[in-house]
Regions:
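Boundary/entry segment of secreted carbohydrate-active catalytic domains
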Residues: 21-53
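Glycoside hydrolase catalytic-domain groove-lining segments
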Residues: 86-88, 93, 101, 108, ...
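The substrate-binding groove and active-site-proximal loops of carbohydrate-active enzymes
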Residues: 33-40, 74-88, 125-138, 159-166, ...
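Aromatic-rich peripheral "rim/lid" segments of glycoside hydrolase catalytic domains that contact
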Residues: 24, 41, 266, 279-284, ...
Length: 363
């Protein structure tokens, strides 16, 4: 084998010292989603949104810039009128505003799969070599553009739930190497909860990123003891894996819906009646307490918040008078005075119920 090939392979596969995500404190983060394409991340309302999140005890936030995906492998980026093509404000302003408040920020690009023919990101795959080639060229260009624009961010996620691309190890390793040339912060990948052990390139990243929708209980009416036992089993599994590959765990998403399946199928989007609220609240309490007490789990980015004046969506709500105190108590041991416009939420919810726009559960 030629000498330059040996050097190249060595540089791609040699382990390095990972950057810690947590420093001296756990990652206590909240993902700020969008009511439409991400434009609201550049609004003045993001400033008050960050303030509200900080009050809960958060020290991290995240946004998830979008690009579209097609069956032919092409990746498309939506351009807002008047926005800079190189560094659109909805990518960059959240970084500036978060840092002003002393918050760290993670940029977590998402492929918008709706209307593409793919049911979810884990299904994204292509039939021909031509389509795969197009995908990797387009995806690489997009990820590098976001990384360049967001190089002041504290963490960057190179991909989210792209299960059927994981056997393309060489393409992923090349992309990681290219991102590191322009971005000096922490880097991870957001693996689906059921596939994190299939990711072959954790050694090239700074942490094991997992979309944390693990089933914690088998039945739909678990007790708190059931949840604690479920988390105990999960933490043991995660701790063993983290030690094996010498990387800590970061939950790149963690969410519990108002659902009777919140513990058994946490990924379920269906919102159930108010009778499901106690289970949702119990899931949050046990999860947050467990994460705080496990050294191998760096922390989590909770799913999901929205920019003011509507910090709530139809599902996976965090900005409610029920859930916010649970988060605050877990993160800072006290519950601050938090104002919440319940009437505004109910008006908006009724508008959504009448069929305005696409479902908010797509992320």
């Amino acid at each position: 084998m030629p000498r330059y090939c040996i050097i190249l392979l060595f540089s791609l596969f040699t382990a390095f010292e990972p950057q810690a995500f947590d420093d001296d404190t756990p990652m206590r983060g909240i993902t700020i989603s969008t009511h439409g394409g991400g434009r609201d991340w550049a609004s003045d309302e993001m400033v008050s949104t960050l303030r509200d999140i900080e009050i809960l005890g958060a020290n991290w936030v995240a946004t998830h810039p979008y690009a579209g995906i097609s069956q032919d492998g092409s990746v498309r980026v939506r351009r807002f009128e008047g926005a800079s093509e190189l560094a659109p404000a909805h990518w960059t302003r959240p970084i500036v505003e978060a840092h002003k408040r002393g918050l760290k920020i993670c940029i977590k690009p998402h492929l918008a799969y709706w209307r593409s023919g793919f049911e979810w990101r884990g299904e994204i795959a292509f039939r021909s070599e031509e389509e795969w080639t197009r995908f990797w060229a387009d995806y690489r260009a997009w990820i590098l553009a976001v990384a360049e624009a967001c190089k002041d961010a504290d963490a960057f996620v190179i991909g989210t739930e792209l299960d059927k691309t994981l056997n393309h190890e060489a393409e992923w390793r090349a992309l990681i190497a290219d991102v590191r040339k322009i971005y000096k912060g922490r880097i991870t990948y957001a693996a689906n909860w059921s596939d994190y052990t299939r990711v072959p390139f954790w050694d090239a990243l700074d942490a094991v990123g997992i979309q944390g929708y693990f089933p914690i209980a088998k039945n739909q009416n678990p007790t708190e003891t059931d949840l604690r036992r479920g988390w105990e089993r999960l933490v043991k599994e995660l701790r063993t894996y983290a030690q094996k590959i010498d990387r800590n765990i970061v939950f790149t998403e963690l969410g519990y819906n108002q659902s009777y399946k919140a513990a058994s199928e946490p990924w379920t989007y269906r919102v159930d009646d108010d009778g499901a609220r106690p289970l949702q609240e119990m899931c949050w309490r046990v999860a947050l307490e467990t994460i705080e007490n496990e050294p191998r789990i760096t922390g989590a980015l909770l799913w999901k918040w929205f920019p003011n004046p509507r910090p709530f969506g139809r599902d996976f709500q965090l900005a409610t008078s029920r859930i916010m105190p649970i988060i605050a108590e877990a993160w800072q041991g006290e519950v601050p005075v938090i104002t919440f416009d319940e009437e505004a939420y109910q008006r908006w919810r009724e508008q959504r119920r009448r069929g305005r726009g696409r479902r908010s559960n797509q992320n």
